[in-house]
Amino acid sequence: MKRVIIAAFKQETSTFNPSPTTRDQFETVIGDDIFSLINSNSEIGGALKVFEAASVTVVPTYATWAVSGGPITQNDLKLISEKLLQSIFDAGEADGVLIVFHGAMAGESEFDPEGRVLETIRN
């Protein structure tokens, strides 16, 4: 049976928005609580249904998301990224990793945090 790690780090940043996004604005579910999203209208909800139908073993790790806002403060971006990455590394070996990103996230001084997270996982 295939084993897939699932995680999320999702926020759409508008660099024109002067109000920074902080970790307090993120909703977070960790570990098995991610399974509570199966009936949500979300990427994770859809993925959980597909994986269940395909008899894929899902390893839930860390999922966090916020509404659109200004750049994420660097300290909070670092903290959230570290929690996400540690949860993925702690999950052990897997056949794949599914990470839900928005694709337009930015920190106060980091313009591609999603790319950095992916690069860290690959290496």
Residue map of PLM features:
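Active-site histidine-anchored catalytic micro-motif
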Residues: 5, 10-12, 16-18, 26-27, ...
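Low-complexity, highly charged intrinsically disordered N-terminal segments
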Residues: 49, 54-68, 75-76, 80-85
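N-terminal amphipathic/basic leader segments beginning at the initiator methionine
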Residues: 1-54
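Charged, low-complexity, helix/coiled-coil-prone segments
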Residues: 19-35, 56-70, 113-117
